[in-house]
Amino acid sequence: RFMLRRARFKIDYLYSGDKMPIVFFALQVDATERGVVVRDMYGQLIDHKWKKISLFMGLFAKPFGFETNLSSGSRESPERGRMNQILFPRERDMGVMLNYHSLLNQGAWYDKIKVSVGLFNGSGLYTTSEQDNYKDIITRIQYLQLKLSPKLSLSAAASGYLGAIRSNNEQVYKFKNTGLSSTNETSNIGKRIDRKYYGADIQLKLKHAWGASEIRGEFIKGVQ
């Protein structure tokens, strides 16, 4: 059997004024024998005065954790880690996000801070319509490349995910000492089910004669 694991095509457009970016558009599709799926379709507006604040609108990756936003071109393996695949099987969603990150790195400590706050549908990449009125709030705060020595740098971040979905059936699943169990409760229909995640990640990078080596760690805890 022959098949295509990935066949992605991306186009983007950047409009600049006074040699600085102002507007950015991106469209990415994944076309395989199973069909064509839009993976990215968003616009980014960048403030022209301070060049620190930008607004994302459309379909794009959720700003939670390190590996969720690490593109396939930057990963050492074709797939993301198992933990990330379970919690975020479709790492993209429709929404709007406000981002703070200085485009003019003048060496100040605050130029290395990146803050993202987004509001998303929560229904994921492949859902054609919103399933409920709940929205997911996702935040991420990063400090990029703190110099520990001329060759050693440290990056760290914390993420938060506050969301919910609507239950459409009577089944309730719970983990107990004996394992996973389920019960039928009529009150569960239409009930709000919380999704709350909290995460932290760290990356230690060492430059050497052959390039650079990096150690990464990520921890996520929450309720699903």
For the regions a language model picked out, list residue spans one by one.
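Detector for outer-membrane/organellar transmembrane beta-barrel domains
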Residues: 151-224
